[in-house]
From Swiss-Prot:
Family classification: Belongs to the aspartate/glutamate racemases family.
Name of the protein in question: Glutamate racemase
Organism the protein comes from: Streptococcus pyogenes serotype M6 (strain ATCC BAA-946 / MGAS10394)
Pathway noted in the entry: Cell wall biogenesis; peptidoglycan biosynthesis
Pfam families, alphabetized: Asp_Glu_race
Residues annotated for substrate binding in this entry: D10, S11, Y42, G43, N74, T75, T184, H185
């Protein structure tokens, strides 16, 4: 038994979609979450800067005595995950491989779409992972740089959000049967995305898929939390306005949380 928390990092609030699924599947595990909303989005930034910011988040989580770190950010996973994983002596998990694997299982016509930040798409990481596992699957990647600002400003239900999503996704409509939400912010726009793509297109939430792998690693390294603990205390940190973060988090997690401000 290991009651240390699991650390989550993201460029902002998007990683809460992963946390929500973890709380549902593994309610006995404690969480420490850091969202770098002050510097979001990461996607348009240079690779060197993204790596620098990611290491700052990692080092913050290490001060919280975490037993595992989850990159709840596709951009950070694409740029820095392998380096961090090779450096630390605790398990470090990214969201890309779980999402890629789920897409392969989902597609019936071998036509998969991937949407993500400009950096995630430019890295080509999803296509590489998918075609490594299933060479016959065709992958169409599309950068959607306007999605993260919509979520970070809590405008998911606005008319402008619907127009942006419709305009952004039009190149993929009718061409795929599976769509990977290759940014953990994007599930917060899921109803609009599904409406645009149509009911026949299966949406893959890479963050939610990641939770299954978290469970596997907890078992493998024998670092599961206390199954009998009914109430666990989570901690949430943001580099931006805690009130905005709290508002979005409370809606998504369906519970009121306390959010602390941190300067990195």
């Amino acid at each position: 038994m290991d009651t240390r928390p699991i650390g989550f990092l993201d460029s902002g609030v998007g990683g809460l979609t992963v946390v929500c699924e973890l709380i549902r599947q593994l309610p006995h595990e404690k969480i420490v979450y850091i969202g770098d909303s002050a510097r979001a989005p990461y996607g348009p930034r240079p690779k060197k800067q993204i790596k620098e910011y990611t290491w700052e988040l990692v080092n913050f989580l290490l001060t919280q005595n975490v037993k595992m770190i989850v990159f709840a950010c596709n951009t950070a996973t694409a740029v820095a995950w392998e380096e961090v994983k090779a450096t630390l002596d605790i398990p470090v998990l990214g969201v890309v491989l779980p999402g890629a694997s789920a897409a392969i299982k989902s597609t019936t016509k071998g036509q998969v779409g991937v949407i993500g930040t400009p950096m995630t798409v430019a890295s080509d990481i999803y296509r590489k992972k998918i075609q490594l596992l299933a060479p016959s699957v065709q992958v169409r990647s599309l950068a959607c740089p306007k999605f993260v600002p919509i979520v970070e400003s809590n405008e998911m239900c606005s008319s402008i959000a619907k127009k942006i999503v419709y305009d952004s996704l039009s190149p993929l409509v009718g061409k795929i049967d599976t769509l990977v939400l290759g940014c953990t912010h994007y599930p917060l726009l899921r109803p609009i995305i599904q409406n645009v793509m149509g009911p026949s297109v299966k949406l893959i939430d890479s963050g939610a898929e990641c939770v299954r792998d978290i469970s596997v690693l907890l078992n493998y390294f024998d670092i599961n939390g206390n199954y009998h603990q009914k109430a666990v205390e989570h901690r949430f940190f943001t580099t931006a306005n805690p009130e905005i973060f709290q508002e979005i988090a409370s809606i998504w997690l369906k519970q009121k949380i306390n959010v602390e401000h941190v300067t990195l």
